[in-house]
Amino acid sequence: MAIYLPELDPENTLFPKPETALDEPNGLLAFGGDLQPARLLAAYRQGIFPWYSNGEPILWWSPAPRAIFLPNEFKPSKSLRKFYRKSGYQITLNNACHDVIRQCANCRSPEETWITEDMIQAYQTMHNLGHCHSVEVWHQDKLVGGFYGLQIGSVFCGESMFSLADNASKIALWFFCRHFSNQGGTLIDCQVMNNHLESLGALEIPRAPFMQQLHQQRAAIIKPNSFVPQTLKIPIE
């Protein structure tokens, strides 16, 4: 069945309203444009993100419902805390963003991944500009897990995560939630629910309350130096 999909104007960074996104496929909003920083920032500030495969035009999405974490409410299980104490893992922030993005791409087959070379370069540029950030989990100096995403005010828009060792992505999320909440962060956007996110405790909310929170928080200012490269440490009960 044919569908109508707006094409973005290459001369500006305007997007259709998110509520006009298709129901099937869920959230598909527009195509075209580019992955330049101005367009990416305009997209994320409206709850829109790119997601496409090699050989496809750039596709822009704003699905409903939306998967989120509330960082101040993330509670690790007793078993996860016990595992971490014995793991020898070290968790860092913004120490290896390019490697994290590359690992997220490599953990999927070329047919499955949406993290194309153009996407890798675009988010590396966003990192260089101070918008894209990564969390890394290290074991014996080897990168074994982590995730990356964009900060928009007090909202963190998660893009992808990977795990090469037991509980690595769970521990990365736990430490980041604690750090981000302490710095004034209020919301983590996970885009689309999946089994892994659900197992970590992600919630789903309708488009309207998600957009309301995003509009309220996208201009918020969190503490300075929140994303300088650092080792993340929290007291373990």
From Swiss-Prot:
InterPro entries documented for this protein: Acyl_CoA_acyltransferase, Leu/Phe-tRNA_Trfase, Leu/Phe-tRNA_Trfase_C, Leu/Phe-tRNA_Trfase_N
Cell compartments where the protein resides: Cytoplasm
Any one GO CC term of the record: cytoplasm
EC supergroup of this enzyme: transferase
Family: Belongs to the L/F-transferase family.
Pfam families associated with the record: Leu_Phe_trans
MF GO annotations: leucyl-tRNA--protein transferase activity
Listed name of the protein: Leucyl/phenylalanyl-tRNA--protein transferase
Keywords, comma-separated and alphabetical: Acyltransferase, Cytoplasm, Transferase
